[in-house]
C-alpha cells in the first residue's frame, strides 16, 4: 500500500499556513506565509513547493481558517471550523493545556479548556492583533521584528491604548516628542496588546494553570510573549510553547483529514 499524507491548510486574514504530515504523524513540510490578500496564488505556490520537494504525493486535505470556507469549495476539499481544528491539536499534542492565548492577523482568542470548552474572541477590531502591531511598526518606520528587537532592551513601560491605530498615535506621538527611548515605546506597544487581550477577552475570568501561546505574533515575537508571561505572573513550568505554535489550526486540519477522499498535489493546483 502506498503511503498517504495528510495536509492541513489554514487561511487567515493576513497569512496562509500549510502543514503536511505522514501516517506516523511526522511533519514533512510546513510553511507560514503572508498572502497580501492574494490567497489562491499563495496557496498554489506552497503546494507547488511541496510537490517540487516530494513529488506528486497522495494526500488527504482539510482547510480551515477565516478565509478557508469558500476556497475549500473551489478546491473541492473538506472544511473544518478553526476552533475545532485548534482544539484537536491541543488535545493531541498538549493535553495538559488549561488555557490557550492565540493572536492572529486580525483576531485574538482566549480558549479555556475546562469541563466545557469556552472560547472568547475579538474578531471585530484589529486592536490587539498582528495587524495592530504591523500598523504601529509602520508608524515607527520599522517592522514587527524591528519592534521586537528593540523591545529586548527596554527600561520603562508607558501606558498606550491598544485600539484603532489612529487613536494610538495620540499616545505614541507625545512620547516621541518628549524623547522617550524607542526601546521603551516598542515594549509599551506590546504591553498594550497584552492589556487589550486580557481585559477585553478574559473580562475578569482567571487565566491560570498551564498556558499555551499560539499564533504567528506570539511565535515570532519573543518580547510580546514575554510581556504576557510577566503580566500573568507565570512560572516557567506553566508556559507551553509548542514548536508549531504558529501552525496549530493547520495541524488540526491535517489531523481531521483521516477519513477524507484521497487526492494528489497536482489535482489541487
Residues covered by each model-derived region:
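Phosphate/pyrophosphate-binding loops at sites that engage ATP/ADP/AMP, CoA/4′-phosphopantetheine
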Residues: 46-59, 197-209
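Short glycine-rich, Thr/Ser-proximal phosphate-binding strand/loop in the N-terminal lobe
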Residues: 3-41, 45-48, 123
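Glycine-rich phosphate-binding loops at beta-strand->alpha-helix junctions
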Residues: 67, 203-231, 242-246
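Glycine-rich phosphate-binding loop plus the immediately following alpha-helix
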Residues: 115-156, 164, 255-259
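Glycine-rich phosphate-binding/hydrolytic loop that grips phosphoryl groups
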Residues: 133-134, 240-269
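Short beta-strand-loop/turn "lid" adjacent to the catalytic site in phosphate-handling enzymes
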Residues: 32-35, 51-84, 111-120
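Conserved phosphate-binding/catalytic loops in two-lobed NTP-binding clefts
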Residues: 79-83, 228-251
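Adenine-nucleotide phosphate-binding core of ATP-dependent small-molecule kinases
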Residues: 168-203, 246
